[in-house]
Amino acid sequence: MYNHFKSYHLFFSCDYESIPYEFKGKQYCVDFQVRFDEARNCIQVIFEQTSSKSDWRVNFNFPSKLYDKFTFDGKLIQLKVHRGWGNMWLVCQSTVRQKIKALLDEHPDSFIEVFGWSLGSGMAQLAAEDIYFKFGIKPYLYTYGSVKPFYGKDTYNFVVTAPSIHG
């Protein structure tokens, strides 16, 4: 896979990692890259846009699903997310976390940027929330052709008011 993103003055190509998975008898894959930008001391997490017929099936898998439970400000939080992107995120979550952790161990003073457009914007939003709650780091989130992966009034209110992403 080949794509371009522009971050401030930086222009680079993406060589996406692809993880295949099956859902209800159909084949899918999630495409992403976790990289380190030495010039800016920045970890970048990048999710590919909608690029195939199977990606469109993911986009139209609307029913909500329950997301991981976690504690925030002493309260147990249970978010609802778009089923297609939620399933896709769960497929790559541990790999993305491992890659981020390895880069944070090497570069503890770095900051994190998360990018995505179209389908990738839903993935990027889920990843940004996950990074904050897993690592305690507020990532910078950049989405293009953005979607809304979080469902429900309570979930929306939490996501909008939580201090998890740099504005």
Name each region found by the language model.
Residues 1-115, 119-167:
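Non-catalytic, mobile gating and regulatory segments of ester bond hydrolases
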